[in-house]
Amino acid sequence: MTATKPKMMDLAYAVLLEKRKEPMPNVLELLPPIGFSPEQVPISIYEGYKRTKIVPLLNLTFEKGNETADFMKQVFAKKWTAQQSCLIVLNKVNRCIDIFKAVKQYLDDNSFNNPIFCLSTNILPAHRFERITAIKTALQKGEKPILIATQVVEAGVDLDFDMGIRDLSPIDSMVQVAGRVNRNAHPIEPKRLHLPLYVMNLGDCKPIYGVLTEKQALASLSGKVEILEAAYLGLVDSYFNALGEMASFQEKSVAIFDAMEQLQYDKVSDFELLEKQRNTVSVFVQVSEPNDAAEKCKSAYLNFKKGFLAKEDFDKNFKQNFHQHTIAIPRYYAENAGLTPLDDFILLAMDVHYDKDTGFIRNSKAKEADIPTFF
């Protein structure tokens, strides 16, 4: 149901074991909060929370091919003010880049001086860390930054915004983004009540998460004007219950479970939580840096591959930094950019291929990828 309180045992029993008349596994929560029994935890902890609310904007329509302009007009310009820090989370890297550019232009056109940042897997890991640090510094100084990001921001990033905007996604993902709004406030007695996370549907949910997720996410939000934080637990619970009851979900789960029992590992290996990024390539980006860190670790990598540098030395002194300058991008963007091979497995990109704000420069003439962008 959440990262810290998963529902997988309940779903596994309902879908796989109950129909075989097998007993419910005895599941013990090892670390319930002190003073609470496991069955008391959900109601006792969550029902008093008042920091945020989810506000569906599913009545809005976005013209295909004109989604960014429609977003700026219907959502951003109407919901955001210069006195608010804002987190915008999208499902695709390309969408993230397009909206970042549009928001940046909007700020310039209106003479707003809010700091603006982009964060996605298209940006080097080394630069992502620097960016998060810069955002934290801006927030601590009382500035009102805007962050446009993909789902990478959900993975343990400790930031606190005044409002959020989320493209349609699994309900638990929405709740994670809501956790970056009014984050540091007292959960029960916040100074500001129920700061909003607006949820829209740009059409990118289905290609990333699948038709079942899109269908159930829409059903979970349908007819609701707003959902207060106290109701999040029930919202997530009902969402996963409904997913578990879908026939196609059950059929796939049973098929995988049967394959595991029969040791048919080829079928098991076909299971994917998200579509694999099969058509991606690893790219080392040799960006100019004051200490020439990228150039040094590239040279060390080549010396290691040629046998001039011991593996132990490379792993100890260069490996981490090498990976901090490596990203995975769709193959056709790399081919379109004319990158040169660093070795048989990794391509080399230079400053000319990399934008300091949005990362690897994706030629707009290349075909857009409908691949996940979590990590």
Regions found by a protein language model. Give the residues of each.
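Loop/turn-to-beta-strand initiation segments
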Residues: M1, S85, E143-I146
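A short beta-strand-to-loop transition that corresponds to the Sensor-1 phosphate-sensing loop
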Residues: T2-P6, L90-V93, A149-V152
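Interdomain hinge/linker at the junction between the two RecA-like core domains of SF2 helicases
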Residues: T4-K79
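C-terminal helicase lobe and adjacent C-terminal extensions/tails of nucleic-acid helicase motors
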Residues: D10, F62-V89, N94-T137, S169-I171, ...
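A short helix-to-beta-strand connector/capping loop
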Residues: Y49-T52, S111-N114, E143
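Conserved two-lobed SF2 helicase motor
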Residues: A138-E154, R166
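Conserved P-loop NTPase nucleotide-binding/switch module
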Residues: G156-D158
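Conserved phosphoryl-transfer motifs of two-component systems
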Residues: M163
